[in-house]
Amino acid sequence: MLMGCKNSNTNDQTSIYADEMVLIVNYQLENMTLEEHAELGSAVAPSFTSENVPGLLGKSFIGNLETEIFGGVYYFSNQKDVDVYLESELWKGVVAHPNLVNFKTDVFKKMIFLEKTN
């Protein structure tokens, strides 16, 4: 579960993301150096725009050098947009890359808790 906090006294637009979903993707490298992985990331990063991926609010590349697990955290407007992405040619191309292996995906609903007022 991913949690966020919202101050109920503020009048922000958090509610427009009430259905926001988070997709976390992990994978390992096989026969690929960190430098080659960085080059690949730089090459594909421009593809991750809201024009190319409907409903995408943002994406961060992640990695742990000690465990050698890498991946991404994607923020989507809703579950339907996550599902569309996971069926897209862009996603199919990512998981088909021969040097990216052992994919794991998890989807979470962003939780928003209102601050209690007295």
Where are these regions (language model features)?
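Short S/T/G/P-rich N-terminal loop/turn motif that feeds into the first structured element of a domain
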Residues: 1-69, 80-87, 103-118
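A common structural junction motif
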Residues: 92-98
